């Protein structure tokens, strides 16, 4: 008696190819049609886990964490130097949704860099900025500019401590003229001191002290005069806004 066997069902060839094309786990190297290439881990056909991406257009290299196809977690971005061709670190820190977010260090030049908080690719929160001219700003940031309480220490040792808005001195603050041994305390509007008081401060230790000390203020109520002037400037500023 003949024995009949059911023929085995085979999947279409296109489906087999599609399964082989699905990317999961570690892949040695995957090239995109635009020339970019990626080496690292995948999940459900997208970059996920540890990996390195190289962009052909600008030569940038990112090494670090990925999540759902985007830079997410800790990673380092490097860019080629236009003159030497050697790679230089541009940013090391945390990412979220393909943008700098959390603590990180951004290098703007050989002697200029920022270390601190980021949000949506912008400096936001607390941070310290080292400028190429030797100045250092340390304090609060918002929308990629100093905003809130902060201190700017100049190369010569003089410093400003006080309020900032839109990247410049705005509001109450103190400026220490340590080279001349004086301290100015007052109110700033758009980086210009509008009113305040100047006193001697560390004049004996100053490298270039003023010729004569500042005489004692004879106003009966200097604090009251300053408060009145501040109120006037604040009112004028509010009306202008």
UniProtKB/Swiss-Prot annotation:
Q: Where in the cell is it found?
A: Cytoplasmic vesicle, Secretory vesicle, Acrosome
What keywords are assigned to this protein? Cytoplasmic vesicle, Repeat
Entry-linked InterPro entries: MORN, MORN3
Stretch list, region Interaction with SIRT1:
76-100
Q: What is its main location?
A: cytoplasm
Keyword Repeat attached = yes
> Where in this protein does the record put region Interaction with MDM2?
6-35
What this protein is reported to do is described as: Assembles a suppression complex (suppresome) by tethering SIRT1 and MDM2 to regulate composite modifications of p53/TP53. Confers both deacetylation-mediated functional inactivation, by SIRT1, and ubiquitination-dependent degradation, by MDM2, of p53/TP53, promoting a proliferative and cell survival behaviors. May play a role in the regulation of spermatogenesis.
In its UniProt entry, what is this protein called? MORN repeat-containing protein 3
Q: What is the originating organism of this protein?
A: Bos taurus
Gene this chain is encoded by: MORN3
């Amino acid at each position: 008696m003949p024995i009949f066997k059911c023929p085995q069902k085979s999947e279409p060839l296109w489906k087999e190819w599609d399964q082989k094309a699905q990317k999961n786990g570690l892949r040695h190297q995957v090239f995109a049609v635009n020339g970019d290439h990626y080496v690292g881990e995948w999940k459900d056909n997208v970059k996920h886990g540890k990996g390195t991406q190289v962009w052909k257009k600008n030569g940038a290299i990112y090494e670090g964490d990925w999540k759902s196809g985007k830079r997410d977690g800790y990673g380092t971005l490097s860019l080629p130097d236009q003159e030497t061709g050697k790679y230089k670190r541009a940013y090391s820190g945390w990412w979220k949704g393909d943008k700098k977010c959390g603590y990180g260090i951004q290098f703007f030049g050989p002697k200029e860099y920022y270390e601190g908080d980021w949000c949506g690719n912008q400096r936001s929160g607390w941070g310290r900025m080292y400028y190429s001219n030797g100045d250092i700003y340390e304090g609060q940031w918002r929308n990629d500019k100093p905003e809130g309480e902060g201190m700017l220490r100049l190369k010569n040792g003089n410093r400003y401590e006080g309020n900032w808005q839109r990247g410049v001195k705005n509001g109450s603050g103190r400026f220490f003229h340590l080279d001349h041994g004086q301290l100015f305390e007052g109110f700033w509007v758009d980086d210009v001191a509008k009113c305040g008081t100047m006193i001697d401060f560390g004049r004996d230790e100053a490298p270039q002290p003023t010729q004569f000390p500042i005489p004692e203020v004879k106003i009966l109520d200097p604090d009251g005069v300053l408060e009145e002037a501040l109120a006037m400037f604040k009112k004028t500023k509010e009306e202008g806004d």
